[in-house]
Amino acid sequence: MGKIICLIIGYLFGCILTAEIVAKANNIDVREIDPESPHRGNPGMANIMLNVGFKQGLIVLFGDSLKAILAMLICYLIFKNNYYIYGGFGCILGHNFPFYRKFNGGKGVLVTIIWFIAIMPKYFWISLLVAAIVVAISGKLNLGAVTFPIVAVPIAYKYLGIETTILVVISAILMIIRNYKDLVCIYKGKYNRVDLRKIK
């Protein structure tokens, strides 16, 4: 029951889409941002940072990180054990599938990173390093997004046990699903390289 409660707590926090709030504060509908952008309509940090502004992107970075941290912290304070893992995982689900948006939210990249930092603080950097190298070589953020949870799977299996590993596997599958359309575009050669120097 405790795990279910933490999933619910995390889900509700995850449903708070900071990018949507920031976009509305700038009189922008995040779903209508640059339809030609590889991050079109995505209520996430990358979309805001690339198409609205760097400072606004930092606000999303802070907000999405905070909601994941608070979800896990509350779960830890309530149960005093590792159920916070489910709070963080629930936050990913809420961010990706908010009920008030017809279960169509963000891609959960930042929230997943924060979750990894919490559940594997000694090893998360390995996944991020590999993902960063992939992005640096390819210029495609989506490839990095799907790389880091995939790399995290064997790490979780070795150090975190089967239960947490299953959640990490699910997070990797979700990342692939949420980035599927862009991955198809990459495969077909229709996905342009992201120039980070163009951040406003």
Locate each region found by the language model.
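Alpha-helical transmembrane segments in multi-pass membrane proteins
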Residues: 2, 6, 10-11, 15, ...
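C-terminal ends of transmembrane helices
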Residues: 19-24, 94-103, 135-136, 180-184
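Cytosolic, membrane-interface loops and tails of multi-pass inner-membrane proteins
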Residues: 21-55, 184-200
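Short, non-helical or kinked segments that cap or interrupt transmembrane helices
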Residues: 31-42, 100-111, 140-151
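Multi-pass membrane catalytic core of lipid/isoprenoid biosynthesis enzymes
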Residues: 44, 49-75
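Interfacial segments of multi-pass membrane proteins
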Residues: 49-52, 75-79, 94, 109-138, ...
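Loop-to-transmembrane alpha-helix initiation sites
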Residues: 125, 141-149, 159-171
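RNase H-like, Mg2+-dependent phosphodiesterase core
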Residues: 137-146, 173, 178-185, 189-200
